[in-house]
């Protein structure tokens, strides 16, 4: 099995556990988010500390911003998921994040073509397009199945979620290149860290 495909499978497992926790109990979800949040912060600290010649004040401000962001992200996620309707919405958005990641990988490997950016040389324009196509297809199909109608608003949300996922991925890729590292951590031995798996969700879900 292709190494990158394995990473996508790990991403799906993490998302499945998160969705299962949401469906079962908010306390379980809370513990899950705490674990993910702590590991994300630790990995982020390590990445920033490896950036050459970074000033102490800048290092402190970047880390402070990330801690605040993760805290707000996890808190709002937990609060919103306590409402059934919003829980369904979050469920659809998380599935869209998965579709964005898988779509980008499949299209990028199959069609290849021009690179998207120097920040992440493995990313291609075809992959970015595939990411959007997969996301819009999934979110539109799921919404139609649940409501028996096409919702333009949800369609637009899916577009922004897909773009957000790709921006999150590029952001973490940018930091890894600056730090000269391949993976954000070793939480999943041989397959990277937590940030490697949830980078897209950090921007995609809040949108």
Regions found by a protein language model. Give the residues of each.
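Membrane-embedded alpha-helical bundles of polytopic integral membrane proteins
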Residues: 1-159, 163
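Final/C-terminal transmembrane alpha-helix of multipass membrane proteins
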Residues: 197-207
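Juxtamembrane helix-boundary/capping and inter-helix hinge elements in multi-pass membrane proteins
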Residues: 112-117, 177-186
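Membrane-interface alpha-helices at helix entry/exit sites of multi-pass transporters
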Residues: 118-129, 184-198
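LysM (lysin motif) carbohydrate-binding repeats in extracellular/periplasmic proteins that recognize
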Residues: 174
């Amino acid at each position: 099995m292709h190494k990158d495909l394995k990473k996508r499978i790990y991403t799906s497992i993490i998302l499945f556990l998160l969705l299962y926790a949401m469906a079962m109990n908010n306390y379980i979800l809370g513990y899950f988010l705490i674990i993910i949040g702590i590991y994300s912060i630790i990995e982020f600290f390590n990445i920033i500390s490896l950036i050459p010649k970074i000033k102490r004040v800048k290092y402190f401000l970047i880390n402070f911003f990330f801690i605040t962001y993760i805290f707000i992200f996890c808190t709002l996620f937990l609060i919103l998921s306590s409402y059934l309707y919003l829980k369904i919405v979050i469920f659809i958005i998380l599935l869209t994040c998965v579709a964005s990641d898988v779509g980008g990988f499949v299209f990028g490997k199959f069609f290849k073509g021009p690179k998207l950016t120097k920040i992440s040389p493995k990313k291609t324009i075809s992959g970015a397009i595939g990411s959007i196509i997969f996301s819009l297809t999934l979110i539109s199909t799921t919404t139609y199945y649940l409501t028996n109608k096409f919702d333009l608003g949800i369609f637009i949300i899916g577009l922004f979620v897909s773009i957000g996922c790709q921006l999150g991925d590029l952001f973490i890729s940018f930091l890894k290149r600056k730090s000269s590292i391949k993976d954000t951590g070793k939480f999943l031995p041989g397959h990277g860290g937590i940030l490697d798996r949830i980078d897209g969700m950090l921007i995609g879900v809040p949108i």
